[in-house]
Amino acid sequence: MYIKLLIVVSIRKYTVQANCTVNLTVQYLAKKWTLLIILELYKGENYTRRFSELKDSLEGITPKILSERLKELEDEKIVSKTIDTSSFPVKCEYTLTESGLDLIEIIRTIKTWALKWKIDNIPCGKQDCKDCVL
């Protein structure tokens, strides 16, 4: 008599942990418009722009989404918000923090990668990047 022995091998599922640093960071940085908002702030004088300037420079973004993304970036200390009530209308400016400025290197790396692998290898200067400063 033959006894068949069935061995069940437990295969560990590899999933991203909820508290993984990359997972937590990607949750807000990978949202549509977030990196472009950071780039537009970087282009501003002293890395600062008013809400209306951001809205005008990001074609297609809605005021609601821009407000949400700026609030998320402010909560993460990537952007600081300054409100000047001494003028009318009230002036609200957003500025990249040191943390936000550190993200510019990541954006440069993304651009380098995209030019090499994804964007038909078109060198800068031949693309309409609206005076990109990267």
What are these language model-derived features?
Residues 1-29:
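N-terminal leader segment of winged-helix/HTH proteins
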Residues 2-3, 39, 104-134:
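Amphipathic alpha-helical dimerization/coiled-coil segments
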Residues 20-65, 93:
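N-terminal helix-turn-helix DNA-binding core of bacterial DNA-binding proteins
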Residues 86-107:
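Basic, amphipathic "hinge/linker" alpha-helix immediately C-terminal to the N-terminal HTH DNA-binding motif
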Residues 34, 46, 78, 112-115, ...:
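Generic structural signal for secondary-structure transition and capping sites
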Residues 53, 72, 102, 109-112:
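Residues on one face of amphipathic alpha-helical coiled coils
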Residues 52-81, 88:
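Canonical helix-turn-helix DNA-binding module
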